[in-house]
A protein has these predicted regions:
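Hydrophobic, membrane-embedded alpha-helices of multi-pass small-molecule transporters
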Residues: 2-20, 36-39, 89-90, 94, ...
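Transmembrane alpha-helical segments of multi-pass small-molecule transport proteins
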Residues: 5-11, 38-48, 80-91, 98, ...
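Juxtamembrane transmembrane-helix boundary signature
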Residues: 10, 41-67, 228, 232
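Hydrophobic, small-residue-rich membrane helices and short re-entrant helix-turn-helix hairpins
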Residues: 22-30, 65, 131-142, 195-217
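Hydrophobic alpha-helical segments and their helix-loop junctions in multi-pass secondary transporters
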Residues: 17, 91, 98, 137, ...
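Helix-loop-helix connectors at the membrane interface of multi-pass transporters/channels
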Residues: 67-76, 97-118, 200-220, 270-292, ...
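Membrane-interface interhelical connector segments
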Residues: 229-252
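Extracellular loop-to-transmembrane helix junctions
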Residues: 3-4, 28-53, 208-223, 313-323
């Protein structure tokens, strides 16, 4: 049961509004045509490798948080600076997801002040789920596993739409598809970096099984979403939100379903970011969650579009590169003092 719970908790962090809207799937996977399978495989391999390697690094360094590993790897001052980067990534991502939930509420709910009310409700709900820890994240992941297949299967059953033109595209090389898949996996793992210490509750063998189960669940959703985008390739060309566009054919019920999927995806990512912020901050968990919620709220005031179109992608890429560095073998001198102090006790 703990393996399934951890796998669902991981799933809740990697599926955000961009995934549920189809934008990320079309950009990183379906756009590669016949090579989309290679992109999916590389993304899953990258996620699995990082999810197994990083907790092992934490155990080897004798620390229980990413900030501690940064200090061991890069020294106190540089470790603190890098931890601030991961804190910024979590707060900005949480703010973007909170803003997305509020915008969805304003679009769906026929009431005044729907934006502000939905933002407040979402932040409170996200804080409660984050306070529950792994069970709260797993509940959000289970909700996504129930909602997304319903949406994707309904979209896949629609007849292929027609377009007035077929976009001219040269065949993609396997290398480009693999690079896109690996980059997607690394970016998502970087956003989950602060929550990955939850895997330390499992022994290495069970940790590997939890990661494999996560890859199976996430891979199935990725494959299903890619099939939808490829099936409707002509109709969704140049569409910023492919699944939202396709849901028009499903009527009001389809529009509500895709909005619910996007809300659940954004909420689950918000919960994961709040958990990560609580782990990054050297404060009691309730205080860390409260400060994390305030940080997400401040960034949400900027608006989803401005956040995504600003330096957010660059920050994500930088944190992904730093995470890869953290997975490199630790020099013996980095953790010998910790082991010596522990043995003296």
């Amino acid at each position: 049961m703990d393996i399934l719970t951890c796998a669902l908790a991981l799933l809740s962090g990697v599926i955000g509004a961009g995934f549920a809207s189809g934008r990320e799937i079309d950009r990183f996977f379906a756009g590669h045509g016949a090579m989309s399978g290679a992109a999916i495989l590389c993304a899953l391999l990258t996620l699995h490798a990082l999810f197994v390697r990083l907790p092992a690094q934490l155990e080897r360094a004798g620390v229980s948080s990413l900030s501690g590993l940064c200090r061991v790897r890069f020294g106190r001052a540089m470790g603190l600076a890098l931890t601030v980067l991961f804190i910024l990534l979590s707060a900005i991502t949480g703010g973007a997801m909170l803003s997305a939930c509020a915008e969805l509420g304003a679009l769906v709910l026929p009431m005044r002040h729907a934006y502000g009310l939905c933002m407040g409700f979402t932040l409170a709900l996200g804080a409660v789920l984050a306070f529950l820890g792994i069970p709260g994240l797993a509940a959000a992941g289970a909700g996504l596993c129930a909602l997304l297949p319903m949406l994707l299967l309904r979209l896949l059953s629609l007849p292929a739409g027609e377009a007035c033109f077929l976009p001219a595209m040269t065949p993609d090389l396997p290398v480009r598809a693999c690079v896109d898949g690996a980059a997607y996996g690394a970016l998502n793992a970087a956003m989950l970096a602060g929550a990955l210490p939850m895997l330390l509750t499992l022994k290495p063998g069970r940790r590997r099984k939890a990661s494999l189960l996560f890859c199976a669940l996430f891979g199935a959703l990725l494959l299903l979403g890619t099939l939808v985008c490829r099936h409707h390739r002509q109709a969704i060309a140049l569409m910023p939100l492919p699944f939202v566009y396709l849901s028009r054919a499903l009527g009001a019920g389809g529009y509500t379903l895709v909005a619910l999927c996007m809300y659940a995806a954004a909420l689950s990512t918000l919960c994961t970011m709040l958990c990560a912020l609580a782990r990054y901050l050297p404060l009691p968990r309730p205080t860390g969650l409260a400060l994390g919620a305030v940080a997400c709220l401040l960034f949400a005031m900027i608006g989803f579009g401005r956040i995504v179109q600003s330096g957010y992608p660059v920050l994500g890429a930088l944190c992904a590169a730093l995470m890869l560095l953290l997975c490199l073998p630790l020099p013996t001198s980095s953790f010998a003092p910790q082991e010596a102090s522990q043995s003296s006790r």
